[in-house]
Amino acid sequence: MLRDHFKDEQYFREATARLKVTLDGKKKDLLSKAQPYRMEYYVLADGLSAYISMAYSQGIPVRSLVAPCKEMLDAYAHCVEPDADYSDGGGLIYSQLLSMISMGVLLDAKEALQGLGSVLADVGYKDYLVSFLLRYVQPTYELPGELLWPEDPALEKLKEATKSNKAEAAEDLYEYLHKLYYTRDNLEDDYGTHKKPGNAYLGYWSFESAAIAKVMNLDDAKLKGSPYYPYDMLHGDPPGTPEAPVEPPPAPDSLREEPAAPKKKWWQF
């Protein structure tokens, strides 16, 4: 059953089928190399993140997203340079890292999260929200007092939520979703992508808000109505949800042969 509020099921079905073909090619390419470049692991992680968001939007059962989530986190851990200093954030895209870790929390990818957390700790990456979420699977993980981007009002609201009692935290997340999340300043290039041609739109899911709700065991009934809140990813598939294959079906030939629209990222057509 379609979960997205801005595009129809056909859009996501075709987009995920195309992306599946691309990801299969990337995986085969990685396996064929004795020592792939770290950027190649990033490309795979980026594509898997896009797939998870679009597949969730389409209505694919949550349980079928666990395997690609683990694969995404493992690939991302391999893209981090072990000898680099990431104390200032390095070259990692913060919003993407926070979203991936949030997916891992929601989909219970414990071992993959622990592995990524160890890699981030080794390179000196320190951020309050990232560490707060990683402590869900590794309670002794160091929790720094500050955000990497303390001037960001949306991130400050999330931090405020984590320091509040449960009732206040739920209200903080409600305010975040309704006033701070879907803004051009917060989403940047992803803002308004549902109006653009091609398949740039992945879904506007705030995985971080649901992950915080899970870690804090919040009553999120009030958040369920937000078009940005991935309720099912936290609570699981509704009763009666049919089984789905772990991987989506391959794209039909007609999709493989269509001319590509101008790309925003490597996996967009």
Where do the model's predicted regions map?
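Alpha-helical oligomerization segments
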Residues: 171, 178-269
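Eukaryote-skewed repeat-based solenoidal scaffolds used as protein-protein interaction platforms
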Residues: 1-195, 201
